[in-house]
């Protein structure tokens, strides 16, 4: 597992560095100045590695910050017919359900996965577990935690519920991923979250309507109910970890 982790992250970083160098060569003004063998220039590789590292850190937090400040907290302050803490948790709950099946982190085909599992013949199970574990721990739990606490407390949400949020997001994603794997074993139909079916889009529309439409008329889930659902989501994630 450790060897798979080292190779997979090295491969991902190499792919990202090469993508950065390729992008530099597509800039008209730089294209003529940069050497043809750009990928072999040590200095440019160091620079690209630094940029890749900075981008990895930013990707952990920047997207979450924008998510909370716009789609959850930013929109939430527009509603005046319900308590702000209830509105915050209500919107977050339904958006998390949408994200659980639209962005599982496990059924998203990417080029680095193709290189690793198809071209390099790496163990698909180990490779997937390494990257999925990284996504759950860092991109969700660590990435969500500071903003869940900050924006939640601004909306007067109790701290203990704020602390549940990242684990609820992670747990629900794990539960949906486990169900999708079970469904694949039963029906043999592989899921590609980049190509969702009509039913998935209809359900997404209904959930968005529930997230943003209901608070407009003063209808939101009470905080206790939302907190209970958060706990159920966490327990579902723990149970699905066996999958």
Feature locations, PLM:
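Hydrophobic alpha-helical transmembrane segments of membrane proteins
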Residues: 1-114, 124-243
């Amino acid at each position: 597992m450790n060897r798979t982790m080292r190779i997979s992250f090295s491969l991902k970083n190499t792919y990202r560095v090469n993508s950065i160098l390729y992008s530099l060569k597509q800039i008209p003004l730089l294209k003529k100045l940069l050497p043809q063998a750009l990928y072999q220039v040590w200095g440019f590789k160091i620079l690209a590695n630094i940029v890749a590292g900075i981008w990895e850190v930013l990707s952990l937090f920047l997207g979450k910050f924008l998510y909370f400040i716009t789609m959850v907290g930013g929109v939430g302050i527009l509603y005046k017919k319900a308590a702000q803490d209830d509105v915050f948790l209500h919107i977050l709950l339904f958006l998390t359900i949408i994200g659980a099946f639209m962005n599982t982190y496990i059924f998203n085909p990417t080029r680095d996965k193709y290189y690793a599992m198809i071209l390099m013949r790496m163990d698909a199970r180990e490779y997937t577990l390494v990257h999925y574990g990284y996504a759950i721990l860092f991109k969700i739990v660590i990435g969500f935690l500071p903003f869940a606490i900050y924006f939640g407390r601004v909306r007067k949400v109790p701290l203990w519920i704020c602390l549940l949020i990242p684990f609820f997001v992670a747990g629900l994603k794990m539960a949906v991923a486990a169900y999708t794997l079970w469904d694949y074993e039963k029906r043999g139909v592989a899921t590609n979250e980049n190509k969702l079916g009509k039913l998935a889009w209809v359900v997404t529309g209904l959930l968005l309507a529930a997230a943003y439409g209901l608070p407009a008329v003063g209808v939101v889930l009470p905080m206790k109910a939302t907190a209970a659902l958060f706990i159920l989501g966490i327990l579902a994630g723990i149970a699905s970890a066996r999958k």
